[in-house]
UniProtKB/Swiss-Prot annotation:
Gene3D superfamilies in the cross-refs: 3.30.70.330
Record family assignment: Belongs to the eIF-3 subunit G family.
SMART domains: RRM (SM00360)
Species: Drosophila melanogaster
Protein name (Swiss-Prot/TrEMBL): Eukaryotic translation initiation factor 3 subunit G-2
Entry GO CC: eukaryotic 43S preinitiation complex; eukaryotic 48S preinitiation complex; eukaryotic translation initiation factor 3 complex
Function noted in UniProt: RNA-binding component of the eukaryotic translation initiation factor 3 (eIF-3) complex, which is involved in protein synthesis of a specialized repertoire of mRNAs and, together with other initiation factors, stimulates binding of mRNA and methionyl-tRNAi to the 40S ribosome. The eIF-3 complex specifically targets and initiates translation of a subset of mRNAs involved in cell proliferation. This subunit can bind 18S rRNA.
Start and end residues of each RRM domain: 193-271
Domain of life: Eukaryota
Length: 273
């Protein structure tokens, strides 16, 4: 931009309207030069020369018709194209029209590209657990727990002292002896498939206890010890499994297992007097 200041004598001779010379333009080759005059922020008259490169391009019919619209208002007598007095030339903004499917894909990637919402439960990687490359290997904690449970169940089944068959109460040890110390006290309680779970938190409930053991095997009953006055958990519970091998699997899997910021202690339930 080059500053051009005229004298008052030149303005009188030229008889300029509002004190500014008229703008002019000329074309030389593939370039168009437009010369304009205006006042800057300091109130001084300046000369502005704009250079445009002429390019020929094929545009849609709607764009061509829009360029031939008749101007109105203060721009009624303007030449085709933008007028610097009413139009401000700026950088071009290219628009791209996409379909609904492309928009959904673009929107999902722009939600938070730096953060992955998927987290693997096996290796804590940024992918879904079903796609984990370590699934089924030694790093898979679920596989390790299942292996321990199956091994404990097999060991319990192979115990020669436990046949796994139903034994009536009168055929058990001392069941047929009359006058014994247990006579008249009802049937003896079978604790062979019961386990004791200790080091539980005070907020432990029956629902939490069932969620903890239901994946190991079916159980017949549960008992969660609670304080008489406050109703809070005393820290231990008893679970009677339907099968002894499931009880052995529970001891192998849950003993030393972290639950609610505590380390569980699971062992066989001792016979009650």
């Amino acid at each position: 931009m080059k500053t051009f200041v005229t004298s008052w004598a030149d303005e009188v001779d030229a008889d300029y309207v509002d004190g500014l010379p008229p703008s002019n333009e000329y074309i030389k080759g593939d370039f168009k030069y437009v010369t304009e005059y205006k006042f800057n922020d300091d109130g001084k008259k300046v000369k502005v020369v704009r250079t445009f490169k002429i390019e020929k391009q094929i545009v849609p019919k709607a764009v061509a018709r829009r360029r031939n619209w008749v101007k109105f208002g203060d721009s009624r007598s303007d030449k085709p194209g933008p007028n610097s007095q009413t139009t401000m030339a700026s950088e071009e903004i290219f628009m791209q029209f996409i379909g609904s499917k492309d928009f959904d894909q673009t929107h999902e990637t722009q939600l938070d590209p730096g953060k992955n919402i998927a987290k693997c439960r096996i290796c804590n990687g940024e992918h879904w657990s079903v796609n984990c490359p370590y699934k089924g290997t030694s790093m898979d904690s679920k596989t390790v727990m299942e292996t321990k449970a199956n091994a404990a169940a097999a060991a319990a089944i192979s115990d020669p002292s436990k046949t796994g068959k139903y034994v009536p109460p009168f055929m058990k040890d001392g069941g047929g002896i009359s006058g014994s110390k247990n006579w008249g006290r009802g049937r003896d309680r079978d604790d062979s498939s019961a386990v004791r779970i200790s080091n539980l938190s005070e907020s432990m409930t029956e629902t939490d206890l069932e969620e903890l053991v239901k994946k190991i095997g079916p159980h017949t009953k549960m008992y969660l010890a609670r304080e008489k006055n406050s109703g809070l958990c005393k820290g231990f519970a008893y679970v009677h499994f339907k099968f002894r091998q499931d009880a052995a699997a529970a001891i192998e899997v849950l003993n030393g297992h972290g639950y609610d910021h505590l380390i569980l202690c699971v062992e066989w339930s001792k016979p009650q007097p």
